[in-house]
């Protein structure tokens, strides 16, 4: 099973904040960073899914999955554009939707979305490393994502809204009304949801392949050596929290 080191988890978090600072405009960056600051401890360790054979069901899996989708969506957008597709959205809109399509998986203001599976039977027979938190009010993941964004006063464009809603494509029955319309007036006005869905699929399957390879991805990858005492202290604190929560 793939694992991330404490250094990788910290590095991925720093990269996530760098992406926000680089791609999100001044008009909503402060509110967005406030949300990420409030959720930092929970989000850094959140998994991307509940079952080992799905994708990134591990501490730190959520942030890594989001970073993969941001990267892949920009790459796929370039391929679409190169081959003649209409690109009528900004990179900021694409990155914003990629960043937040799974935001609902961090839970709400009080509760985690995933909690550790405490049933040995489910862990052994269903590969359930985590389970859904029964204390959490039910919402679909995109709906909770949009609710959290509005709670923090983060404005969302119509393209971002639809992109976040439709990233799961036809895997979500609720998306049929958008994706299977037989009236051209009701069709999508942008290719962004298709690009996001392809990026999500690509990330999910690659992460699943990494899980299958198992021991080949056990060793830490791309881990930076701390350059300052403050950075080393931050890593040491994170390791302590990592050990407390998961060992």
Model-derived segments and spans:
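Divalent metal-dependent catalytic cores for phosphoryl transfer on phosphate-bearing substrates
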Residues: 55-58, 64, 76, 87-211
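Generic detector of well-ordered alpha-helical segments enriched in charged/polar residues
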Residues: 10-21, 29-37, 161, 165, ...
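Acidic/His-rich, divalent-metal-binding segments that scaffold phosphate/diphosphate chemistry
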Residues: 1-124
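Acidic, carboxylate-rich catalytic segments that either coordinate divalent cations
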Residues: 181-247
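Residue-level signal for secondary-structure boundary elements
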Residues: 24-28, 44, 172, 207-210, ...
């Amino acid at each position: 099973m793939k694992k991330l080191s404490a250094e990788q988890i910290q590095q991925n978090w720093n990269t996530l904040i760098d992406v926000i600072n680089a791609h999100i405009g001044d008009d909503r960056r402060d509110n967005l960073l406030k949300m990420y600051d409030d959720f930092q401890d929970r989000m850094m360790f959140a998994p991307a899914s509940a079952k080992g054979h799905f994708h990134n069901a591990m501490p730190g899996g959520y942030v890594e999955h989001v970073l993969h989708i941001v990267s892949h969506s920009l790459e796929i957008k370039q391929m679409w554009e190169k081959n003649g597709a209409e690109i009528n959205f900004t990179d900021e809109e694409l990155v914003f939707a990629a960043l937040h399509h799974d935001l609902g998986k961090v839970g709400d203001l009080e509760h985690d979305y995933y909690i550790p599976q405490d049933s040995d039977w489910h862990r052994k027979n269903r590969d359930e490393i985590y389970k859904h938190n029964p204390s959490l009010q039910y919402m679909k993941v995109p709906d909770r994502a949009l609710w959290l964004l509005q709670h923090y006063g983060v404005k969302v464009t119509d393209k971002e809204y639809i992109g976040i809603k439709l990233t799961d494509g036809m895997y979500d029955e609720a998306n049929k009304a958008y994706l299977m319309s037989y009236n051209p007036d009701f069709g999508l006005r942008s290719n962004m949801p298709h690009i996001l869905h392809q990026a999500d699929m690509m990330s999910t399957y690659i992460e699943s392949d990494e899980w299958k390879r198992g021991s080949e991805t056990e060793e830490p990858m791309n881990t930076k050596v701390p350059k300052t005492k403050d950075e080393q202290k931050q890593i040491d604190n994170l390791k302590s929290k990592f050990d407390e929560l998961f060992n």
